[in-house]
């Protein structure tokens, strides 16, 4: 899995990894994993983090070494880039299947994910992604936002 990463990606991950490997022992604690991944532009949920940690932390000691971390990031990046997964995610947001994500649909999904957002926050998220300015997010705009993560 990690062999599909470019040298640039590997050195970027190594740099981020060592920022959080405070004592330089080659391991990071599980609670630091989320921070590391967010610093690399990934945005895992708590549930995703727990799943990833469970997959990697076989002995349950709460730490992850660099090779395990690389495999994790490679897997996460592969998932993120998958066209089918993007379409599926878009369909989850686009409740009425009209090809657009409205503010109401975005708020609904985010609430279901446990993210209670104000109207202003929802509007801001829409505005950030809404390239053509129609007040909704179409599939192309959605993909652009997801790929930028």
From Swiss-Prot:
Residues 8-43, 44-79, 81-116, 117-149 form the EF-hand domain. It is found in: Cytoplasm, Cytoskeleton; Cytoplasm. Its main location: cytoplasm. Ca(2+) 4 binds at residues 130, 132, 134, 136, 141. The keyword Thylakoid does not apply. GO terms for cellular component: cytoplasm; microtubule. GO terms for molecular function: calcium ion binding. Ca(2+) 1 binds at residues 21, 23, 25, 27, 32. The keyword Ribosomal protein does not apply. Gene3D superfamilies: EF-hand. Pfam families: EF-hand_7 (PF13499). Keywords: Calcium, Cytoplasm, Cytoskeleton, Metal-binding, Repeat. Ca(2+) 2 binds at residues 57, 59, 61, 63, 68. Ca(2+) 3 binds at residues 94, 96, 98, 105. Belongs to the calmodulin family. Calmodulin mediates the control of a large number of enzymes, ion channels and other proteins by Ca(2+). Among the enzymes to be stimulated by the calmodulin-Ca(2+) complex are a number of protein kinases and phosphatases. Interacts with KCBP and CIP111. Binds to IQD1 and IQD20. This protein has four functional calcium-binding sites. This is Calmodulin-2.
């Amino acid at each position: 899995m990690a062999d599909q990463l470019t040298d640039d990606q590997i050195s970027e991950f190594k740099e981020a990894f060592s920022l959080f490997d405070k004592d330089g022992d080659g391991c990071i604690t599980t609670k630091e994993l989320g921070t590391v991944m967010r610093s690399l532009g990934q945005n895992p949920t708590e549930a995703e983090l727990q799943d990833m940690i469970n997959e990697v932390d076989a002995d349950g000691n709460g730490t992850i070494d660099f090779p395990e971390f690389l495999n994790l990031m490679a897997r996460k990046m592969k998932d993120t880039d998958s066209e089918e997964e993007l379409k599926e995610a878009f369909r989850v947001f686009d409740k009425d299947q009209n090809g657009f994500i409205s503010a109401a649909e975005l708020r609904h999904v985010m609430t279901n994910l446990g993210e209670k957002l104000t109207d202003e926050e929802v509007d801001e998220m829409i505005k950030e992604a809404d390239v053509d300015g129609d007040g909704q997010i179409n599939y192309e705009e959605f993909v652009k936002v997801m790929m930028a993560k």
